[in-house]
Amino acid sequence: PHPPIFIAASRSHETLEFLLDNDFNICIAVVQDTRDALSLIDRYREGCAERSRTDNMGEIPFFRYVHVAPTDRLAEENVKNHVEWIQDVMQWRRHLTQTTEVNRDIDDWRKIRNELPPTYEYIKANRGFIGTPEAVINQIMELKSHGIKYLGCNFSLAGLSQEKVLASMRLFDEKVRPFI
C-alpha cells in the first residue's frame, strides 16, 4: 500500500492515459492556463468514467497564483515584477537542455533569447487569481462551477516579501474564504 500519487499532467495524451491506467490522480499546476486545465480535468473525468473509477475531485489540487489586496492596483504593484521573474526563470530553465547547472547570468540570457515569456497581464488573466477579494471570489466560484473542489493557492511569489504574502493570506482568510 502507498499514499495516493498525484501527477501534474500536461497536455500530453500519453501522460493522462498513464495516470488513468495506473490509478494515479491528476494535479493541476500553475503552468497551464485555466481554460486548458479545465479541459484536461474534463478529459480526466471522462477517462475515470470509462474505467469505472472514481475521479476523486475532492482531492484533486488545482493550483493558481493567488494574491489578494484591497485594490487591483495594489495587487499589481505587489506582484507584477515577481510574476514576471517567475516566467523568465521558467523559460530560462527550458533552455538548459544539456545540464541542470546554471552557468550563465539570467540578465545575459534575457539579451539573447528569441522569444518572450507570458506577460504579467497574460498570467493574471489565465493562471492567476490576483486582485480584490471580490475579483478573487468570482474566479474561484467560476472554478467551482466546473466541479473544482480543491484550490491550491500559490501565495508566495518569487521574492515577494513575507509581509505582503501574509497580508494577502489574511485578506484571503477574512474576505474570500467565507464566501467560497
Whereabouts are the PLM-identified features?
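Internal, glycine-rich beta/alpha segment that forms the wall or movable "lid"
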Residues: P1-N22, R35-D42
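Hydrophobic faces of well-ordered beta-strands that scaffold small-molecule active sites
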Residues: I5-A8, F24-A29, G58-Y65, L151-C153
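Active-site-proximal loop/turn and secondary-structure-junction residues that shape catalytic pockets
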Residues: R11, Q32, V66-V68, L157-G159
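An alpha-helical appendage that flanks or caps ligand/catalytic pockets
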Residues: R35-H146
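C-terminal helical cap(s) of enzyme catalytic domains, especially alpha/beta-barrels
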Residues: D36-G47, L160-I180
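Glycine-enriched alpha-helix->loop->beta-strand junction motifs that scaffold or abut catalytic
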Residues: F18-C27, G147
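Conserved, mostly hydrophobic/aromatic
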Residues: I5, L19, Y44, A75, ...
